């Protein structure tokens, strides 16, 4: 057994303008090459675009999008007697949110166009309405877990 204590879980910090943890999670995932100010710029422009286009509270749209994309189940490869099975496992809410943020950003990067803020805002609005690539990814993951339900006892 390890003599060290377990590492304490760090709480996600909130961003300076909206005081929101989800915004900060998104900013930290947008971040490339240490350019955090650019990541904040992209995020705040996306939020502004959401505000103008939907005329709703952009933070509620963001929350709704992340809630819609957050998966409940995922599959994990488990090797059993020489063959690898995709075993469905339940995931915690923090891990689910992290996956949702990752999928939203991947889907928005895939969208056509040059402006990342516009692509991100349109992906968030689509996800809040229940469509878009990120939602498709969640449904695909759930389908995989459902298809491999027979291997759930390998957990």
From Swiss-Prot:
Role of this protein: One of the primary rRNA binding proteins, it binds directly to 16S rRNA where it nucleates assembly of the head domain of the 30S subunit.
Keyword 4Fe-4S among record annotations: no
Gene Ontology CC annotation, any one: small ribosomal subunit
Database matches in InterPro entries: Ribosomal_uS7 (IPR000235), Ribosomal_uS7_bac/org-type (IPR005717), Ribosomal_uS7_CS (IPR020606), Ribosomal_uS7_dom (IPR023798), Ribosomal_uS7_dom_sf (IPR036823)
Keywords: Plastid, Ribonucleoprotein, Ribosomal protein, RNA-binding, rRNA-binding
Gene3D superfamilies assigned to the protein according to its UniProt record, in alphabetical order: Ribosomal protein S7 domain
UniProt GO molecular function: rRNA binding; structural constituent of ribosome
Annotated protein name in UniProt: Small ribosomal subunit protein uS7cz/uS7cy
Statement: the UniProt record of this protein carries the keyword Aminoacyl-tRNA synthetase: no
Subunit structure comment from the entry: Part of the 30S ribosomal subunit.
Species the sequence originates in: Cuscuta gronovii (Common dodder)
Subcellular location(s) of the protein: Plastid
Family: Belongs to the universal ribosomal protein uS7 family.
GO biological process terms, semicolon-separated: translation
